[in-house]
């Protein structure tokens, strides 16, 4: 078993793992223990009351956080004609069709999000084995296959996050950076939880959002008291 660093020992000593903290107190703890030499991300884990073995209970979607994520996403768009011009005007970093597909096949993947218009999926479909494992395959459920590519680009650039539950029914995503204000982080978390509640499967019974925990890139998780949100 790996030895705990002095930092992790200090964090564990300062966080009561049996307690759910009021959101502002939880964020204050994250900031207190964020001592890395870079600006750490603030991540969230949301335990959902679903059975992830059942396909009709899996949760997947996207939402735009009111204060963004603290990083600028590079966006690649598969489209053509007027849509290509609209995508460029909206701030897309890469726009193309077969030419863009060839770049990706060569391993040139300098982007974080891939968007496609429906007519471009015949080209994108050839890249499933490359984009799929990286979570980059366009999907209409998260708004990355769309007729309105310009809006999708703007959303991606303005702090949209994509989420899906893992095999344990937990959503893992980021809600900003540790240098965000407490208000910004709280409002971003509220936006995520509102989106998740809207995406609740009709077949899911009982309590849907069972537990919410926040952490920094290098820190321990802090459970959040949901009534404080």
Swiss-Prot record:
InterPro entries (alphabetical): Ribosom_uL1_bac-type, Ribosomal_uL1, Ribosomal_uL1-like, Ribosomal_uL1/biogenesis, Ribosomal_uL1_3-a/b-sand, Ribosomal_uL1_CS
Superkingdom of this protein's organism: Bacteria
Keywords, alphabetical: Repressor, Ribonucleoprotein, Ribosomal protein, RNA-binding, rRNA-binding, Translation regulation, tRNA-binding
Biological processes per GO annotation: regulation of translation; translation
One Gene Ontology MF term: tRNA binding
GO CC term, one of those recorded: cytosolic large ribosomal subunit
HAMAP family: Ribosomal_uL1_B
Family: Belongs to the universal ribosomal protein uL1 family.
Assembly behavior: Part of the 50S ribosomal subunit.
Function as written in the Swiss-Prot or TrEMBL entry: Binds directly to 23S rRNA. The L1 stalk is quite mobile in the ribosome, and is involved in E site tRNA release.
PANTHER family registered for this protein in UniProt: 54S RIBOSOMAL PROTEIN L1, MITOCHONDRIAL (PTHR36427), LARGE RIBOSOMAL SUBUNIT PROTEIN UL1M (PTHR36427:SF3)
Protein name: Large ribosomal subunit protein uL1
UniProt source species: Haemophilus ducreyi (strain 35000HP / ATCC 700724)
